Amino acid sequence: MYDRMIVPLDGSQLAEQVLPYVHVVSEGLKCPITLVRVFDVPAMIEGVSGATIDRVANELRADADHYLERVKGTLVDVGTDVSVVGKQGDAASVIIEEAEKESSTIVMISSHGRSGVTRWAMGSVAEKVLQATNNPLLIIRDQAAEGSSLIEGDRNLEDWNALLTVKNIIVTLDGSSISEQVIPHAMAFAKSLAVPLTPVRVSNSPDDDSENNEYLNNLVKRFRDENLQCDGGEVLHGNPATAIIEVTERIPNSLVAMTTRGRSGIQRWVMGSVTDRVVRHSGSPALVIRGT
């Protein structure tokens, strides 16, 4: 499914909230992990010499490498290769560049983290990556204030699993082949996280409900044939984004899996507005696949 997993971190406890998913998902997917920390130093600081700026950059690089090695130490039992990348530059640009080295790379990122000289405004970084990357993307939304760092102390897989908040995966579909591209990704995550799947199809008209229910029943059978838990699907009506957000409110602790359609690059999406709204306003973690 994936040849590599990229995990951007900024050193904050909020950014580290993605780590339980990295541990548990990597146990199932068995793909190499690359931990990334990006730091930036202003090119021109009034009254500060170039030598001083270079020294600061070297200190930040050493700090990034040290932190990433500490995180790597928590991943010794995942059964796959773990590498680290500490790099100077714009956080979103570096993450996208690293991800696009391989099209089958998935980016797993927390949507918030502290801002500051060496830390990112993670909400902004995650949004930029979401808009620009062609790679699959898992966005974990922070749900709590910062506490103790997740890289402190010893934890086994059971301990990491206990930290997961996702208890269900909502698979959003509109019946198109593009929207269905998210299905194998959702199935892979359901297997790794050991959670049920809830497929939903957004309909323009109640007159189509019979066809939509048949579509969902076939998908439910497909999931069950793969030994995945699925209690049934649901047909939604109305504005697609609003309907999906309402489902996340009725089924809390859900991961929303969806395909976005639109241009890659820094430009805004053309057809990805539904995904955009759901990611921004649902408060739920999201697995986003760019349709091709």
Task: List the predicted regions and their residue ranges.
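Structural beta-alpha unit
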Residues: 1, 73-107, 146, 225-256, ...
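Small/aliphatic-rich secondary-structure junction motif
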Residues: 1-51, 161-211, 217, 221-234, ...
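C-terminal functional regions that serve as terminal interaction/effector modules
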Residues: 24-25, 215-216, 224-227, 237, ...
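Intrinsically disordered or low-complexity boundary/linker segments at protein termini
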Residues: 1-17, 80, 106, 127-181, ...
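Glycine-rich, Arg-bearing micro-motifs that act as flexible, cationic patches
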Residues: 106, 110-132, 146-147, 259-281, ...
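Hydrophobic, ordered structural segments
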Residues: 71, 78, 86-88, 97-110, ...
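A short acidic, glycine-rich active-site loop
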Residues: 53-66
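Short, structured motif recognition centered on aromatic/hydrophobic residues
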Residues: 7, 25, 33-35, 67-68, ...
